[in-house]
Amino acid sequence: MKLRKNSAGDFLQTVRVMLALVALTQSFFGPLAQSAHADDDHHGKRTRTPIKHVIVIVGENRTFDHIFATYKPKAGESVNNLLSEGIVNEDGAPGPNYSKAQQYSADITGSTTYELSPTSGKALYPVLPAPLNGGPTNVCTDNGICTLHDAISSENGLALNYYQYMLTGGTGLTGKVPDTRISGVNGSSPYSSLMPGPFQLTNSKGADTFPYDSYAASPVHRFYQMWQQEDCDISHATAENPSGCLADLFTWTEVTVGSNVNGAAQPPNFSTDYAPGKKTTGEGATAMGFYNMLQGDAPYTKQLADRYAMSDNYHQPVMGGTGFDEIFLYFGDAIWFSDENGNALTPPHNQNVWAGGPVDEIEDPNPVAGTNNWWTQDGYGGFCGSITNPCPTGVSNVYGGGSYTDCSDSSHPGVGPILTYLASLNPPIKSNCEQGHYYLFNNYNPGYFGDGSDAFTDTNSNNTPFTIPGTTQRSIGDVLLENNVSWKSYNDQWNAYLTDPYQLNYGAVGPTSDQYCNICNGFHYQKQIMTNDGIRKAHLKDTTDLYADIKKGDLPAVSFVKPSGWVDGHPASSKWNLYEGFVKKIVDAVKANEDLWESTAIFVTTDEGGGYYDSGYVQPLDFFGDGTRIPLIVVSPYAKKGHISHTYADHVSILKFIERNWDLNTISGRSRDNLPNPTTVQGNPYVPTNSPAIGDLFDLFQFKEHDE
């Protein structure tokens, strides 16, 4: 990648671009269209509330406690977080109830069966394993973003004063070494003196070695890993925590198996703690880090929470990572491996595919004999064959890829322990797994390219075999189309992706930059959307179209919005302040159009928790989830100012809000939007008594009276 150098010419060019952007912004926020479309034919059905426009903005990979650990609500409101629980103090140090979040190790070396809640050799960590470095060492050298011109030409989705943060925040560390920016982490043995629980990433005592603007490492966030990290067993259940999930194995799972094993043997020099010459999962205790709002972290997020409404009981809908959670946001359900007509098929299992192999796309989280939790087959898929990365004996080009499970069959690896646990609950929870269906639990590319052509059958050498066939399952898009309710999916850098289907320009700097997230756009998986030229072209758009539609006051009823990889807030590859800048640009634009603002609700969330620790209650809804809590803020003139909802909810609650507001049917007979709204008992608003149940988010609003 060619890097730009600072020079007088670069400076003048940057000034020109900045001036042009300022002029564009003045035009953008100047006199706008005087009215947004009301509840007329443009939006089909009339709405039950003054909300005529829903905008759903989805960032990446942060739990509620990770961001809101020390948040303090306004008088009369309460919040459940690390501070309120006494787990940490206001300064981020361990609090009087720190033991609630302490982490344990286990030793299951004699087991060859997936352990959902291991008890063998379970022991409190004396200190946490050292969290390891993640993210660019130097932003200019590693990301190629060296000047404001580089930033502005590569990404158009930030409020102007946030572009500076695309140039900053490098870790200054090289490789997967102890992250010495964190207080309590050392560059020599002993590498960690961190207590065995949550720790503050940022610090304000002495040298500010980890400012909020820094890149941070990313923990493991896969399906079976998260189930294990939650440590769920009915024997742990209490009235306040009837699921019996202790969330005390986050560290142990990430240092014993991590992610992307892909069927490889455990290295002979493997270690669960960092040491020179040893091989680790590359994470350490990364999952336990959090930010401190009381010391100025996440300032725009705090501002929105203070001014509008949020939930402290909103969850990622499944255990695991981005693709699976995003799929639930659109389908309210998991999708399975099928043929073009929707008939369930078996994924490749220890066999060659067009790209080589053998691959094994069926998940097997059973530990390899003689190891302590090193799994048999689990990963996004491996690639080999270069001089620096030769293939193992008997392998050609690709291998691994365990990400599908037939969760209807208790004999399949990993399935039995979860089914047994779900059946033990009161009431027992149904799996919602259909016989012979292999569900996708982790990230695979969708089955279509942006032009609607088939990505699953494409054999171009730049393509990946770790792609799920297109699905005929129904999504919220079908429901909206059937009811003449307008919608668009706005995806940052979609236009660049259309001319770069294999994303060879991913990470490129400048106008060709293509950091579109294909696994984040649920409609991208769906046959009836992607293969219909009229529907696809009308409804799948770039965020440049979003800004234009806001300016014209011509926003659809429902908008799904996804930032690019530059600014989505994903740990290691992005930063939370960049996601804040992305959200701010949209919020400011909508508020600048008074009529549009008066009829809009903006839901700001993340796709999932990214594997970070969270202390909140997790309600089992089916085999797939729920997972940890994640942030949700509702920005609207109708939002209850400073209110914090405790009603149990997840991504499908957004679908329930849309369906209730526009009086729509549910997606299918098995989709999670059929679940009832929760009922609770006094004194425990977080736990539904009619489980499984999720809310519809209406309690975040006050529609009778509002003012700005």
Residue ranges of each PLM-predicted region?
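N-terminal secretory signal peptides that target proteins for export/translocation
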Residues: 1-13
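A subset of signal/propeptide-processing and intrinsically disordered low-complexity segments
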Residues: 4-5, 34-36
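Compositionally biased, low-structure terminal segments
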Residues: 12, 29-30, 69, 251
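Sec-dependent signal peptide hydrophobic core
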Residues: 12-23
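N-terminal pro-sequences and low-complexity stem/linker regions of secreted or lumenal proteins
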Residues: 36-708
